[in-house]
Amino acid sequence: IPEASFYWFEDDVLCKCRPDIICKPQGPHQDYEIVVVDYKTTYSCSPESFKESVLKYGYAEQAAWYRRGMEAAGYKVKEFVFVAQEKKPPFASKVFKITNEQMDVAWLTMEEHLHAYMRHLKGEKPTVYNSPNVVTLDLDVQD
């Protein structure tokens, strides 16, 4: 299923996810199991480079968000994979996946962001505004 939108409520907040592709495994008793595929363009498909992109852009948290949306729709996400393709010739591509343990950590981070957003909607200012105006940075400078 390409680019289907899924909507659900978290308390009173309307939420949405739109995975690039949803694949349903073939076989009995697998009607609600799915594999979610997310397409990403990148400058390099090397594992080290794509890992940096995953960390920099929060792709793991996005995967957790999509999983949450799919579960709200009644599906069980069997696997989440990224199809990464380079932006320049030869347009190399590679498939990456995150482990269940990594997904669990991303899920917790995503939940923190969601709850912070819900608190913001109720009028609470983000914690960055509740901190001192002057913060001393501890820079680890090597000689």
Model-derived features: positions:
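Short, solvent-exposed loop/turn segments that connect beta-strands within catalytic domains
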Residues: 10-12, 27-33, 74-76
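A generic structural motif
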Residues: 7-9, 22-26, 83-85
